[in-house]
Regions:
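C-terminal beta-strand-loop-alpha-helix "lid" module of Rossmann-like NAD(P)-dependent dehydrogenases
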Residues: 1-248
Length: 248
């Protein structure tokens, strides 16, 4: 199951890299033309939505506890700045925990064991609509990054607004589960930042570049969320495998 989760991440990477290059190039071109891009505009932050990815079940060591504690710490920091915070919970464990403590939960989604583009799209469509309407000023992803079969790391990534380049891949790692001497080991490879595609100044687009950007952005955001779902599921599976091994 961990191998399948790994393969899912690796299969989507070439498409993601190409999409990031085109996206970066379009943003660069539109900025040069002084076109306003709402998804890149930093605005006064009043409300922050935290998308918290946890599991639907227990018996997976401290996997759920780590992400819940990370979320509580982030909520505390944001409230100390005088900001309103709401949650979008992906996974039953976080949803039940925070609702019992009367933390505002905006929406709940089950966490699929084999995340698909459709799963991610159902979440990102709502998040994007809320951001563009001005109802939400910042959206962050809280997920569990896969480090090794016995180690995972609760992490935070900003989904919206986008960074000035539109790219959020710096420091990304791809994990690969391999077998050495009959034992499972995890090898990780740091992913280089995808440099923006350089479009010639006299290049003519069949469609307006802004229309192209508006069509690509949902795909990009969907890919970012799908990646975090896949990483979280792999971390949960590894934590469950480790917990079962310790119990036996």
């Amino acid at each position: 199951k961990v191998r399948r989760a790994q393969d899912a991440v690796l299969r989507t990477r070439p498409f993601s890299e190409t999409l990031q290059k085109v996206l970066g190039g379009l943003i660069k071109r539109l900025k040069a033309d002084a076109i306003d891009l709402p998804l890149l505009t930093e605005r006064t932050v009043k409300k922050v939505v935290l998308v918290v990815i946890s599991g639907d079940r227990g018996l997976c060591g401290s996997y759920n506890n780590y992400i819940i504690k990370k979320t509580e710490a982030r909520i505390k920091d944001l409230k100390a700045e005088g900001l309103d915070v709401e949650l979008v919970c992906v996974g039953t464990k976080a949803n039940v925990y925070f609702r019992r403590r009367e933390t505002p939960v905006r929406k709940f989604f089950n966490c699929p064991q084999a995340p698909s583009a459709e799963n991610a799209s159902s979440i990102t469509d709502e998040l994007l609509a809320d951001y563009l309407s001005g109802e939400v000023d910042r959206i962050e992803l809280l997920y569990t990054r896969f480090v090794s079969l016995i180690s995972c790391e609760a992490s935070i990534r900003t989904l919206l607004p986008l960074s000035p380049s539109g790219l959020e891949t710096d420091g990304d790692e791809i994990f690969q589960l391999t077998s050495v001497g009959g034992q499972f080991v995890v090898k990780s490879e740091t992913v280089p930042v995808a440099e923006p595609e350089e479009f010639p100044a006299d290049m003519i687009f069949e469609q307006d570049p802004l229309q192209i950007l508006n069509a690509i952005l949902p795909l990009y955001l969907n890919g970012q969320l799908l990646r975090t779902l896949q990483e979280s599921v792999a971390s949960e599976l590894a934590s469950r495998m480790s917990a079962m091994s310790s119990a036996s």
